[in-house]
Amino acid sequence: MAADIGIDLGTASILVYVKGKGVILKEPSVVAFDRDSNEVKAIGEEARLMLGRTPGNIVAIRPLRQGVISDYTVTEKMIKYFVQKALGRRTFKKPRISICVPSGVTEVERKAVEEATYAAGAREVNLIEEPVAAAIGAGIDISKPCGNMIVDIGGGTADIAVISLGGTVVNSSIKIAGDDFDEAIVRYMRKKHN
């Protein structure tokens, strides 16, 4: 039997939901690989622990920047790894995967996420805008004829949307989010406390 999987592919972290089991993985969106051979050395938490601590030929990177794919091949490998880790076994049927994208991404960026997910082994891919997924995850009935404002602040983007009657009425995505907040705090602390 094929699995239904939901993936929140974020700049800072990735969450994997499996139907009937709930959220079973939450790990950093980091991949460590050998620059010389392009061999993946670690993914997720193990790779995050390598950030800034690797020899010259091992590079630990975050393959998404501001909510979009910055390294297609590495993102594909990361998605494949987390899908296999979530399923924990070989399946005869490829899974159906619903994956989140920021509300302001271009058609090219949407296509890149879709293609990377298919290449990672999906049978069917559904792209869902992050504010819609956040509303559903918060238990909001998005089918009602009243507006719900959703503000989803991730690591790379902040998505703001008004959702009503099952769709997005208006939305905006800005590329200022959690990573920028962290950097601003670090700059302030350095300036204030040397």
Model region roles, listed by residue range:
Residues 1-153, 161-194:
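Nucleotide/phosphate-binding catalytic cleft detector across ATP-hydrolyzing
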